């Protein structure tokens, strides 16, 4: 497997600078926070009360670590990351810049006048071991239960994962994909770039599902395989003609079905 060999070899050349001091003097560490003596805490990091930070953790500058967060051993958190209260992060995880984990889920209840009232989001986000989150990833906390990201999941830049989602082990989610609250993704799935997942009621994927780029998934998938719904590009004039034909499919189908059957 040459590609795997390349991946392993490339890690030997990765440069990770070591700061001159373990905890920058501008960092703010709250009461009862338990920070391992091997952890590296960058400039202007805020660590709130009751946080637990494991062995060999690196937190870069301007991060906010909320009350009660637990960060496992050897986690690497890049600059400007926000972990809301009670987030649980496993061992050997990586979170890249600008990601926000544990923000309130998007839940509102309308009244008889069409006004929307917020639903308190009382759960948390639980992230397993060896999870990698790209830059600008947003994962909302659960409404009652937790949002769960299992071991080995890899998430590309600018992905949104809604409240109470559950992503199975070793699933890959590519850039700009988004999933509505309550979505359940099985193990070893591949969600390609720009995929949107959401419909009437929560969507569920079985294990080993691949969804190609720009697909819109509106119903659950219970058979492993590759699924597509995005339309590939074509010359603009041809695309317009095809779009017009698509809008007339119902009419054309009725005409075909209404024709008398030939006797032969």
Where are these regions (language model features)?
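Short, basic phosphate-binding NTP loop
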Residues: 1-26, 30-31
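Generic structural signal for well-ordered, non-membrane alpha-helical segments
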Residues: 2, 124, 249-252
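Conserved protein kinase catalytic domain
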Residues: 6, 10, 228, 240-243
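Structural signal for interior beta-strand "rungs" in well-ordered beta-sheet cores
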Residues: 22-235
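Long, leucine- and charge-enriched amphipathic alpha-helices
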Residues: 233-264
